[in-house]
Structure formats: C-alpha cells, structure tokens
C-alpha cells in the first residue's frame, strides 16, 4: 500500500489523520481508493469527468505527477503521495 500525506484542509475528511494508506497500481487508482474509503475527499480531488482537479497538486516521492504520467504514473508499495491543494489569495 502506498502512503498518502493528507494536507490540513483535507484531514477532517479522513478522520483527522495526517497519513493514510491506499492500494493501487498507479496514482489514479490510489487516489480513487482514497476517495472510496473517504467519500468526502472525492469532490476535493476530482472533477466531474474523474480528472484531477486543476487546483490539486500531487507529488509522488517529491516529483509532480503532472510532469510524470499524471494519474497513470505507476505507484509502488513503498511510495509516498503528497496532496497539496493550490492556494490563491490577495
């Protein structure tokens, strides 16, 4: 199982946990597994077509998955995903 580091804004959706584990062969599978186990995360992670929301950044072992293979990026059991929602303000 891969480890997912949960940002503070999403922690209420996962019972306050800083990290959770999820199964999957690639980033998309792992995030969908997270959303299945914690349904309140689905709308924050995914758009209506199942794509990653554009304001959500996901890193696999410190590499932005958007410059890798996106949701199709392979994930190993010892890998760590970090979810970082983009911040905006003024």
Question: Predicted segment positions?
Answer:
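Ubiquitin-like/PB1-type beta-grasp interaction modules and other compact soluble beta-rich domains
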Residues: 1-89
């Amino acid at each position: 199982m891969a480890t997912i580091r949960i940002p503070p804004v999403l922690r209420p959706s996962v019972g306050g946990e800083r990290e959770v584990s999820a199964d999957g062969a690639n980033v998309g599978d792992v995030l969908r597994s997270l959303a299945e186990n914690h349904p309140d995360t689905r709308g924050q992670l995914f758009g209506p077509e199942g794509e990653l929301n554009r304001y959500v950044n996901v890193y696999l072992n410190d590499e932005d998955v958007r410059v890798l293979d996106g949701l199709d990026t392979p994930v190993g059991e010892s890998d760590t995903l970090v979810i970082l929602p983009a911040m905006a303000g003024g």
